[in-house]
């Protein structure tokens, strides 16, 4: 489960909306792949949605919009979980407030579900340390 990054610092915009449209005809429940929405404190699952054809999910993007499909896909090798993701951004008129200039608003934040065996790499700080300089282009690291 994760919450998406909010600010795109390089173009001074803020993501405010996510739209996910699923394109999978005849998706079977036993294949997993259901998207889950979790509460702000990650204490309970609020809802889940099958990735079946024409199912659509629209939600606000903020630091507490916890979502994802955490269970391993078990569909046949010739089947893929297909979706279209659209994001709506607004321009930030002023420079970002100092309290927002924290790393967590510029990266996806991975979160562990309670009472699960979600892997340790889901910890945001450990993940960030592992990938920061190894994989990110230099322009992401400026400022």
Regions found by a protein language model. Give the residues of each.
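Glycine- and acidic-residue-biased ligand/ion/polar-headgroup-sensing regions
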Residues: 23-25
